[in-house]
């Protein structure tokens, strides 16, 4: 007696069972849309951060001026691709006019894909120049097998790029070194060179004829890795020359990554220290006249004290992790 009623109840509920997959599919679509929206939001945030940091560096150090012709050195790696990409997009909103010319030095390394950069740059519709110079053969002839060739290769490359800049009429040479490169160089000089010396954001070249700028000076390498993946740059491997890796620099890179992971704020403080130097509390008499220092008998509220407050408390560290806010005159970012 109850069986038909039970059957009828199941039949009545059957349409609901058939609609369940449709409801589930709709939910999956909504979840997919939410993921896409979140991903798009994060991507936009990443670009805005890169644009803000590059614009800040340009403004802080007056890297690019009205009428400049900026020679962007493009190696085919993630850093130089990102530098070119961000500079091109900033130029659209910059309050000044400047030109960009992309330059690649083809050093005739075995396996170098010569077609990649010309094809990529042609699509961007910007002026570019490929300089063909067989420095690879020179380096292989002069450096013993198994030794790193980076130092000699870098010197040869630098001289060629300086010459090309003059031939193209470039007023600035832009290199793709980022914040991590600067910190690695600082530690290398400190640990192995006995010098407090980093990598300047702007410098006059040793030939006195060129100004070199590093627009990525404030940018973290991890952000450049994410941006390169997002933009799907056609990356060219950097180990085609077969040189032994620079093990000391790799060691510094690993050290910085480990500190950043284990001790939040430490790497930020290290970087901030590069722009907060107190020569009177170091020991370089070329920077501060220790020999002629005398007591004046007058108090100076801004003068030195014999014993500084310990800078390693939690409050002190947290207060130093962020750079002070500064006005960026180079470009407005609100509409990016």
UniProtKB/Swiss-Prot annotation:
Catalysed reaction equations from the record: cytidine(32) in tRNA + S-sulfanyl-L-cysteinyl-[cysteine desulfurase] + AH2 + ATP = 2-thiocytidine(32) in tRNA + L-cysteinyl-[cysteine desulfurase] + A + AMP + diphosphate + H(+)
The protein's Enzyme Commission number: 2.8.1.-
Further information: The thiolation reaction likely consists of two steps: a first activation step by ATP to form an adenylated intermediate of the target base of tRNA, and a second nucleophilic substitution step of the sulfur (S) atom supplied by the hydrosulfide attached to the Fe-S cluster.
The keyword Oxidoreductase is annotated on this UniProt entry: no
GO molecular function: 4 iron, 4 sulfur cluster binding; ATP binding; magnesium ion binding; sulfurtransferase activity; tRNA binding
Annotated source species: Paraburkholderia phymatum (strain DSM 17167 / CIP 108236 / LMG 21445 / STM815)
Pfam families in the cross-refs: ATP_bind_3
Oligomer status and interactors: Homodimer.
Pathway it works in: tRNA modification
Ranges for region Disordered: 1-42, 301-328
Residue stretches of biased makeup (Polar residues): 315-328
Role description: Catalyzes the ATP-dependent 2-thiolation of cytidine in position 32 of tRNA, to form 2-thiocytidine (s(2)C32). The sulfur atoms are provided by the cysteine/cysteine desulfurase (IscS) system.
Location within or outside the cell: Cytoplasm
Cofactor(s) needed for function: Mg(2+); [4Fe-4S] cluster
GO cellular component terms given for this protein: cytoplasm
Cross-referenced Gene3D superfamilies: HUPs (3.40.50.620)
Annotated positions binding [4Fe-4S] cluster: 150, 153, 241
A Gene Ontology biological process term: tRNA thio-modification
Protein name: tRNA-cytidine(32) 2-sulfurtransferase
Family recorded in the similarity comment: Belongs to the TtcA family.
